[in-house]
């Protein structure tokens, strides 16, 4: 049974989200949801690491484009991870899908950290041969996206 069958977005790490939004809009006519800036805690190798990310998604879909940028040294640092970065998929069972992808050879890179230091919300994995990351997003986060897509803030 295929695990990642509900594609949501294609993630691109850029140096400047607003500048990239403008360039892509001028070239393609795509439009964007409001720019978001989040402080978040990631779980990396069992350690909680605080960072930030700035991002936006296209209005048009069905598979949207995400542009993201973050501080130097982060997973959204253009100098380290710039360009096509990941494919994002909704998941009904984040932990089971992580385990299944790991059983297939994928490496868990990081994910959202819960208050108790566990993994929650989303996770990034990388297959051993492609270099293109897989982001699993828990469907429990869908209301946050729906609120943002309806014109509110993310969350």
Language model: regions and residue ranges:
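Core segments of cupin and vicinal oxygen chelate
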Residues: 2-4, 12-61, 96-120, 151-154
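A contiguous, mid-protein "functional segment" used to position or interact
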Residues: 107-139
């Amino acid at each position: 049974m295929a695990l990642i069958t509900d594609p949501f977005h294609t993630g691109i790490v850029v140096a400047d989200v607003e500048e990239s939004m403008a360039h892509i809009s001028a070239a393609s006519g795509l439009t964007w949801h409001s720019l978001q800036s989040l402080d978040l805690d990631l779980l990396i190798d069992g350690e909680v690491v605080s960072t930030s990310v700035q991002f936006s998604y296209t209005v048009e879909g069905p598979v949207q484009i995400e542009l993201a940028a973050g501080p130097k040294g982060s997973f959204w640092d253009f100098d380290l991870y710039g360009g096509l970065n990941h494919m994002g998929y909704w998941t009904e069972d984040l932990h089971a899908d992580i385990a299944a992808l790991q059983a297939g050879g994928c490496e868990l890179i990081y994910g959202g950290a819960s208050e108790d230091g566990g993994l929650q919300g989303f996770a990034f994995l990388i297959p051993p041969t492609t270099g293109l990351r897989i982001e699993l997003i828990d469907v429990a986060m869908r209301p946050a996206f729906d609120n943002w897509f309806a014109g509110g803030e993310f969350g």
